[in-house]
């Protein structure tokens, strides 16, 4: 405790808050959309946020304290996008079962030390193509909405582009704040009365089906590992730290598993937002930056405890506001994954078919397009690498 007091700094606390704010600013509305797509009621949606806040907050806080470097954890935005894309194919309890299995798999793969070895067999081009395909419709949706809400969408895009140009690190946060301010000028709506109350966890009995395990749990596992944990580890390394890979991945998997029956669909290492807590602006001494990770964890815990208030606030905004924010928030993720998917010329054909199949939304035997896209891509890659006998 004495060291914690000595290492404490206001910039570190602020960095932790910004990391938290970037993590939830837009994707929080996606969580609501994802839960609703599975048929969750208001109490269950509140429980999702309670579970996510406590699982992410406790894991980030404890790991940062134990290893003395900033460990920012978060939920997976592409993961919740996958859940939304699976609308109508699984019920809430099948999805909860898939979340539970995914968490167990992450813990096993993390603690066993086979994380990097396992992922080495799946080319990055294919996983990125799968992600880009899943997310494509969210980017397209914002432009298709222009026919009805032209002024509002153009204003949102202008805010995003200007803030991206001037303040790239905080562009999403600024888009959320300024978007909320201008929204009443374009769309008539009324904020519901906000009541401050503690969230109540709701147990959702897991149900298991092969279709949900293959169509949701498996793609979610791949997404969590490839789009969050891999870049999250790389981000920590890039600032000169030596991350405890097995422990970080393993314990986030444990937190995921424990809180899955209450609505926790993912707990992973933060990737992009983690840079705020790792940067030298937090503290000149790298050994004291872990305070930012602890601070971020505390804010997530507070979010979880007051989840009911957060949900009632977010659900007061019109649907087009959520659609616009979701699309804009995913621009960077879509472009990043498209670039990586088609960077390797030799794997481009397989990546293209993975991308198109994943974007199609096709379903076979109740299994979603993300799984089939990845399987198709692996098949094409193997086919093209075979040396035909003369």
Residue ranges and their predicted role:
Residues 2-6, 12-31, 50-131, 243-331:
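Helix-loop-helix junctions within the multi-pass membrane cores of secondary transporters/permeases
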Residues 88-194, 295-390:
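Membrane-embedded alpha-helical modules
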Residues 49, 56-57, 209, 348-349:
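Intrinsically disordered, low-complexity segments enriched in polar/charged residues with Gly/Pro
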Residues 21, 25, 38, 62, ...:
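Structural signal for hydrophobic packing residues in well-ordered secondary-structure cores
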Residues 9, 91, 167, 209, ...:
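Alpha-helix initiation/capping motif
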Residues 25-26, 151, 227, 269, ...:
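Residue-level signal for transmembrane alpha-helical positions in Major Facilitator Superfamily
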Residues 1-46, 172-245:
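Helix-loop-helix hairpins and the membrane-proximal interhelical loops
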Residues 31-35, 59, 80-84, 140, ...:
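Predominant activation on well-ordered alpha-helical scaffold segments within soluble catalytic domains
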């Amino acid at each position: 405790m004495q060291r914690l007091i000595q290492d404490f700094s206001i910039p570190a606390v602020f960095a932790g808050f910004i990391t938290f704010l970037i993590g939830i600013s837009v994707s929080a509305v996606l969580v609501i959309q994802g839960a609703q797509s599975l048929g969750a009621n208001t109490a269950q949606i509140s429980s999702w946020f309670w579970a996510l806040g406590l699982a992410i907050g406790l894991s980030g806080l404890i790991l940062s304290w134990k290893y003395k470097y900033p460990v920012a954890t978060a939920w997976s935005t592409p993961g919740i996008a996958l859940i939304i894309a699976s609308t109508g194919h699984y019920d809430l309890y099948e999805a909860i079962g898939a979340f539970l299995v995914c968490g167990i798999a992450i813990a096993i793969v993390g603690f066993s030390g086979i994380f990097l070895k396992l992922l080495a067999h799946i080319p990055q081009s294919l996983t990125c193509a799968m992600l880009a395909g899943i997310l494509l419709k969210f980017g397209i949706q914002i432009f298709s909405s222009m026919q009805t809400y032209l002024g509002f969408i153009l204003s949102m895009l202008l805010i995003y582009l200007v803030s991206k140009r001037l303040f790239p690190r905080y562009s999403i946060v600024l888009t959320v704040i300024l978007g909320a301010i201008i929204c009443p000028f374009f769309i008539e709506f009324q904020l519901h009365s906000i009541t401050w109350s503690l969230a109540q966890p709701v147990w959702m009995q897991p149900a298991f089906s092969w279709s949900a395990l293959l169509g949701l749990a498996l793609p979610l596992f791949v997404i969590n590992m490839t789009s969050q944990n891999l870049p999250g580890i790389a981000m920590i390394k890039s600032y000169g730290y030596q991350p405890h890979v097995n422990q970080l991945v393993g314990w986030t998997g444990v937190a995921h598993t424990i809180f899955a029956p209450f609505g926790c669909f993912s707990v992973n290492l933060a990737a992009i937002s983690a840079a705020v807590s790792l940067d030298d602006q937090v503290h000149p001494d790298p050994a004291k930056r872990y305070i930012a990770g602890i601070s971020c964890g505390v804010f997530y815990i507070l979010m979880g405890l007051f989840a009911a208030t957060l949900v009632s606030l977010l659900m007061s905004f019109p649907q087009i506001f959520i659609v616009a924010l979701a699309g804009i928030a995913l621009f960077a993720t879509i472009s990043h994954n498209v670039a990586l998917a088609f960077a390797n010329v030799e794997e481009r054909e397989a990546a293209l078919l993975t991308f198109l199949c994943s974007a199609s939304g096709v379903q076979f035997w109740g299994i979603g397009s993300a799984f089939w896209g990845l399987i198709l891509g692996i098949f094409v890659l193997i086919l093209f690498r075979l040396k035909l006998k003369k």
